[in-house]
């Protein structure tokens, strides 16, 4: 009689859900207070003028205006600021 031995189980077959990180509003765009600018893990971007940071490092607008990205400082850090429109 033909018999097939039981196959071994695989260790693959899992994948985590994407976290939808990244820049949400780009340079020159108009924002309202409270708009999310960047979702990130750690401080890839730092908050500049009129930008707050949440406990998960999310950057958000504190006032209405235009988004401005800049690289400055001795460590060439990326800063996100809100300039009054």
From Swiss-Prot:
Give yes or no: UniProt keyword DNA-binding: no
Which PANTHER family does this entry report, sorted A to Z?
Answer: LARGE RIBOSOMAL SUBUNIT PROTEIN BL27M (PTHR15893:SF0), RIBOSOMAL PROTEIN L27 (PTHR15893)
Write the lineage as a comma-separated list.
Answer: Bacteria, Pseudomonadati, Pseudomonadota, Gammaproteobacteria, Cellvibrionales
- Give the UniProt entry's GO cellular component terms: cytosolic large ribosomal subunit
Keyword field: Ribonucleoprotein, Ribosomal protein
Would you identify the family this protein belongs to, as annotated?
A: Belongs to the bacterial ribosomal protein bL27 family.
Protein name as it appears in the record: Large ribosomal subunit protein bL27
Q: Name one GO biological process term.
A: translation
Query: Its Gene Ontology molecular function terms?
Result: structural constituent of ribosome
Q: Does the keyword Cell cycle apply?
A: no
Q: Where is this region: Disordered?
A: 1-22
* Disulfide bridges in this chain: none
This protein's species is Teredinibacter turnerae (strain ATCC 39867 / T7901)
InterPro entries reported in the protein's UniProt record: Ribosomal_bL27 (IPR001684), Ribosomal_bL27_CS (IPR018261)
